[in-house]
Amino acid sequence: MSFCTVLSAAVQGLSVEMIRVEADVSNGLPMFHMVGYLSSEVKEASERVRTAIRNSGMKLPAKKIIVNLAPATVRKRGASFDLPIALAVLAAMNYVPEEALKGVAVIGEVSLEGKIRGVSGVLPIVMEAKNQGCTACILPEENEIEGRLVSGIKILPADNLEKLCAYLNGDEKEIHRKKQGRSSAQRNIFENKKEDFSDICGQNAVKRAAEIAVADCIIVAADTQVPM
């Protein structure tokens, strides 16, 4: 296998866009190049991923590695694509089986030492992954409680890249999986939660206008469509 696709997602305003992370490893001038309408923090993932893979006991070959985040029309922001990029590259190099990633959404930031850090926007991403037919979601251990608020999809929390790869290769002891379902505390959070502007990603100008309007009792009409 020299090519692999891993599913991920990006929060775009009030919606979630599923993203395909494609990795190709081939002969050629050694390089690690990423494309797909990327922000600066996503472009920096190439250095984080390469270092994390090396510090997790695996080696990148002296080959041409191309990573594409599709669709190219969607702007990719944040560090949540680190983990799907790493797994796509590792699967393309046969470090992990591609079959283990079928129907699995992946999100998470990766540190230089290979630890998997928490990210924002987990709840809507897991909900959309379930709606799109994903059977499981790999996410940072820090975000496990948030991910488990969504029923009907298996949550696989991970705290470092090395253990995650061992799990994907069949060592189920490497990832601690709690029983599915909501605890009473989780149910209280989910059922008693009220609408809050902090739940909305972006739309800062619209939120600010609404706050001013409420303070002055002004009626406003706003186009909430996110400009491309």
How should each PLM-predicted stretch be described?
Residues 1-217, 221-225:
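Peripheral, non-AAA+ core regions of ATP-driven protein-machinery
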